[in-house]
């Protein structure tokens, strides 16, 4: 404990946090071992531990991994509730676009260790600017198209210890031929945008990307 409190005070605080995150009978459960808890309960305990010192920001790395849909919804609802109660920010790291759409306010999309697009969640889902972001959206399974093959992004991610000289996504990008410069394979694009709230890394002019992505987005959102 960073607060250097006494053992009795620390236990009281721990029980308070366990109760806050929805652990029943916290005094009893505090004496039990991890294997006696379900996956969802273990996740709640981890959240309680992170809240012990009333942080201003909570970093949640894949908090819903390996949880069934019902428990996943409970954990996300808990995080949203705690965000308001503690007046804190949450940095949520996840590969699940459904989770992103459900809880995020702003989104940073990363590829090969770099942010390739950042913006409000609605802009990311309804008006993406980065080819990689569009590729992710196209690969999401949809009930309305359960008989169609998923559109996977071709190729493989690059090695982080041997990145391409230019844009790391260039070898997999189907739009690089539309670039106004021959820089996709030689120059890494800067994080830019016509809006200060929505930016991306791409050599293809933004207005042309909107035009090229329009048909693809119609299929994704339809």
Regions found by a protein language model. Give the residues of each.
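Short catalytic/signature loops enriched in Gly
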Residues: 24-27, 120-222
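Conserved ABC ATPase signature
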Residues: 32-37, 41
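ABC-type ATPase nucleotide-binding domain
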Residues: 1-3, 110, 170, 176
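ABC-type ATPase nucleotide-binding domains, specifically the catalytic core motifs of the NBD
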Residues: 1-9, 36, 119
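Conserved ABC ATPase "signature" region
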Residues: 8-28, 56, 137-141
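P-loop NTP-binding/switch modules centered on Walker-like glycine-rich loops
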Residues: 54-63, 67-149
């Amino acid at each position: 404990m960073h607060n250097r409190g006494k053992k009795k005070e620390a236990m009281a605080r721990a029980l308070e946090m366990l109760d806050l995150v929805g652990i029943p009978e916290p005094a009893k459960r505090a004496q039990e071992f991890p294997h006696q808890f379900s996956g969802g309960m273990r996740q709640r305990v981890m959240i309680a531990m992170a809240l012990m010192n009333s942080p201003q920001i909570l970093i949640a790395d894949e908090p819903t991994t390996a949880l069934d849909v019902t428990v996943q919804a409970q954990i996300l609802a808990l995080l949203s509730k705690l965000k308001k109660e503690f007046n804190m920010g949450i940095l949520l790291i996840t590969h699940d676009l459904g989770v992103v759409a459900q809880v995020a306010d702003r989104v940073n999309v990363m590829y090969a260790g770099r942010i390739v697009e950042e913006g409000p969640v609605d802009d990311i889902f309804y008006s993406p600017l980065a080819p990689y972001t569009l590729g992710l959206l196209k690969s999401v399974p949809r009930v309305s198209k359960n008989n169609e093959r998923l559109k996977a992004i071709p190729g493989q991610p690059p090695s982080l210890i041997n990145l391409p000289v230019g844009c790391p996504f260039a070898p997999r990008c189907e739009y690089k031929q539309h670039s106004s410069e021959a820089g996709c394979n030689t120059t890494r694009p800067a994080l830019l945008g016509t809006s200060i709230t929505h930016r991306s890394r791409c050599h293809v002019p933004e207005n042309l990307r909107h035009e090229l992505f329009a048909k693809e987005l119609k299929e994704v959102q339809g």
